[in-house]
């Protein structure tokens, strides 16, 4: 089980990312537009730097929904490898079976 403070920090970052997502998308579209002039891009870059650090989606960490484990998380299920195996062995995930060859 991960520390609750770390899990809560990640949730706080997720809220910040969602809060600034639209504003960030507008600024990034100005920066990526080939037709915009240099002054507009410079001002957009300044606006992007003024946003909070945690508004960047890169700072989010994918964690297990049950335990908060940061590594070995399957994005399709949102679970860590250990919990995924436990739940799959109980047959609670439809269509997921143990491989045998």
From Swiss-Prot:
BP GO annotations: translation
Primary role: Binds 16S rRNA, required for the assembly of 30S particles and may also be responsible for determining the conformation of the 16S rRNA at the A site.
Top-level division of the source organism's lineage: Bacteria
Subunit details: Part of the 30S ribosomal subunit. Contacts proteins S3 and S10.
GO molecular function: rRNA binding; structural constituent of ribosome
PANTHER family, A to Z: 30S RIBOSOMAL PROTEIN S14 (PTHR19836), SMALL RIBOSOMAL SUBUNIT PROTEIN US14M (PTHR19836:SF19)
Key words of the record: Ribonucleoprotein, Ribosomal protein, RNA-binding, rRNA-binding
Species per Swiss-Prot/TrEMBL record: Nitrosomonas europaea (strain ATCC 19718 / CIP 103999 / KCTC 2705 / NBRC 14298)
GO CC terms, sorted: cytoplasm; small ribosomal subunit
InterPro entries: Ribosomal_uS14 (IPR001209), Ribosomal_uS14_bac/plastid (IPR023036)
Stored Pfam families: Ribosomal_S14
Family: Belongs to the universal ribosomal protein uS14 family.
Name of the protein described by the UniProt record: Small ribosomal subunit protein uS14
């Amino acid at each position: 089980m991960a520390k609750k403070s770390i899990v809560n920090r990640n949730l706080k970052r997720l809220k910040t990312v969602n809060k600034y997502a639209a504003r960030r998308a507008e600024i990034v579209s100005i920066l990526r537009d080939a037709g915009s002039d240099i002054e507009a891009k410079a001002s957009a870059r300044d606006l992007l730097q003024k946003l909070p650090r945690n508004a960047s989606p890169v700072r989010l960490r994918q964690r297990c929904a049950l335990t908060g484990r940061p590594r070995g998380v399957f994005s399709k299920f949102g679970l860590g490898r250990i919990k995924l195996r436990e739940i799959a062995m109980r047959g609670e995930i439809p269509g997921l079976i143990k491989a045998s060859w």
